[in-house]
A protein has these predicted regions:
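Aromatic-lined substrate-binding rim segments of carbohydrate-active enzymes
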Residues: 32-116, 214-230
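N-terminal carbohydrate-binding accessory modules
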Residues: 3-46
Length: 524
């Protein structure tokens, strides 16, 4: 079943610290020569690069075995692999084939102009859409021929998978304008499936029908790719956000509420991946991070990989959250080649920390957590086997004027890793964390602090429990800022104490700072 990573997928132990190029950034060798070195300089280890069917097969090629690769144009593919190899970058190719953002505008001209051979999907009113019908065998065979040729060429160009480590099949598959295809071929399949009798006739039932149909189509490409050149394969999804109904967003793609239909229809796909642009980053991640479950026979349901996310000043802390909370396979802001230095700075800083943690084999730990805070969602409490950790946004501390002057808070975030009893690493930006025993936490005082970190005014304290504290307390034994070398060894940089720990009350990383802190605790 889907979700069981193939042998090649299981070898993706290094995190994908990625960035996706804008749609037209790899349409010439000159662009490729210019953009890939810039991606390396930003700290990426992987670039997601479109592979354009319309440029690869401008003239329709024969499907005969003898000529199947002779006249495909792989110039851009070859240049991407060559430059990436020189820059020590990995590549994930994005197959812009029959569908890109639902539509079929990356198909070659000969495909677009022959709607008789390659029919379009239709609305219930009979309106043709710029969406090729997934029920047409001609559509499938043309797509399959080109994608198979691409996979064979990649196998010849990069046989050991040193550069190309994964493939995306199509891009944000889904229906728009209509929840399902009503073309004659689609109606025939709909009746043969007895779909209305099984699921009803509303738009949500229509979406399920299309999800299974799209998945079955993709399975043909995935199965062929697996036989030609075995590597991880995934499909990505545009989210169903803002209360939109099927047909108002790219419906029937690999969305969280349709995962079972995609599992059934496309068992050769390794990952279903969310493209996250709207608010609610943590919620979207949770829907796609599906851990081991007994009913899956101990197999991973779906591992989180984010191939597209809005590239912004908050991208870095979001990456740390995804790796810390969900042991993500990778993170990739979209159109990073067009982003401003202000937007890419957080990505570079976060990837520097993540690369160090990877050196120390500290990613994908079972005992790790992710934090992501903003002005409304500003605190999380975790009980780690008797160690109660309260992590907050840095601006919950009163002495930074931006905390109270009406400024919009940038997101703060981090990942916390348990190394052992009373031993943690905190990596991130814009967070503060304290540690208490459960008894201590239950009886902690609630107080309003002034800018000096003490009670704002005398008597401004309320105590939850006035009984005498029983049991032990936790204190900070040491807080060291560290780096992690290429060989995985931890390198001491400086000791945080005094004002930097509020006299032993907490560990913190300021807004705009990017650090790894090694925190040790003790009981007293």
């Amino acid at each position: 079943m889907m979700g069981v990573l193939t042998v090649s997928a299981q070898k993706l132990n290094d995190p994908i610290l990625g960035g996706e190029l804008s749609n037209s950034a790899a349409t010439s060798v000159e662009d490729i020569d210019e953009v890939l070195p810039r991606m390396r300089a930003l700290g990426l280890n992987t670039v997601l690069v479109p592979a354009y069917w319309e440029l690869m097969e401008p003239r329709e090629q024969s499907q005969t075995k003898e000529s199947r690769e002779q006249k495909f144009d792989f110039t851009l593919i070859d240049r991407t692999i060559d430059v990436a190899r020189r820059e020590q970058l990995h590549v994930v190719f994005l197959w812009f084939g029959v569908w890109k953002n639902s539509m079929s505008y990356y198909t070659p001209a000969w495909f677009k102009q022959d709607t008789k051979r390659f029919p379009r999907a239709m609305t219930a009113e009979g309106k043709q859409m710029e969406i090729a019908s997934c029920f047409s065998d001609n559509v499938l065979q043309a797509d399959l021929k080109a994608f198979s040729a691409l996979m064979r060429h990649i196998r010849e160009k990069d046989p050991q998978r040193e550069v190309v480590i994964m493939m995306q099949i199509e891009n944000e598959i889904g229906m728009l304008e209509s929840a399902r295809d009503h073309s004659p071929l689609a109606e025939k399949a709909y009746k043969q499936e007895h779909w209305a009798e099984r699921y009803g006739t509303d738009e949500y039932a229509d979406e399920k029908f299309m999800a299974l149909s799209y998945a079955r189509y993709v399975e043909h490409l995935a199965k062929a790719a697996r036989e030609i050149h075995d590597m991880p394969l995934y499909v990505n999804a545009a989210m169903n956000s803002r209360g939109r109904r099927p047909g108002e967003y790219p419906s029937a793609g690999p969305l969280a509420h349709l995962i079972d239909f995609w599992h059934e229809g496309a068992p050769s796909i390794d990952l279903l991946a969310p493209d996250i642009y709207d608010t609610g980053f943590k919620s979207w991640c949770a829907q796609y991070a599906m851990p081991l479950r007994p009913q899956d026979g101990g197999k991973i349901k779906n591992r989180l990989f984010i191939p597209e996310s809005r590239c912004c000043e908050n991208s870095g802390v979001r990456a740390l959250y995804a790796f810390g909370e969900h042991q993500a396979l990778g993170f990739s802001p979209f159109a990073i080649d067009q982003a401003s230095p202000k937007e890419t700075e957080s990505v570079t800083q976060a990837y520097t920390l993540l690369r160090q943690l990877s050196n120390g084999k500290l990613l994908n730990c079972k005992l790790s957590w992710g934090f992501l805070f903003d002005q409304e969602d500003r605190e999380r409490i975790i009980d780690d086997d008797g160690v109660v950790m309260t992590c907050r946004h840095y601006f919950t501390l009163p002495w930074d004027p931006r905390a109270t002057d009406g400024s919009t808070w940038p997101e703060g975030g981090a990942m916390l890793i348990r190394l052992g009893k009373f031993d943690y690493l905190l990596a991130g930006s814009g967070v503060v964390i304290d540690f208490k025993t459960p008894t201590e936490k239950q009886q902690e005082q609630q107080k309003t602090l002034g800018e000096d970190g003490f009670a704002e005014a005398g008597g401004n304290t309320s105590q939850k429990n006035n009984k005498q504290l029983n049991g032990k307390r936790l204190g900070l034994l040491s807080v060291d800022e560290v780096s992690i070398a290429d060989d995985g060894s931890m390198q001491y940089l400086r000791r945080h104490n005094g004002d930097q720990t509020h006299q032993g009350r907490h560990a913190r990383i300021g807004v705009g700072e990017w650090k790894i802190l090694h925190i040790k605790l003790y009981e007293y």
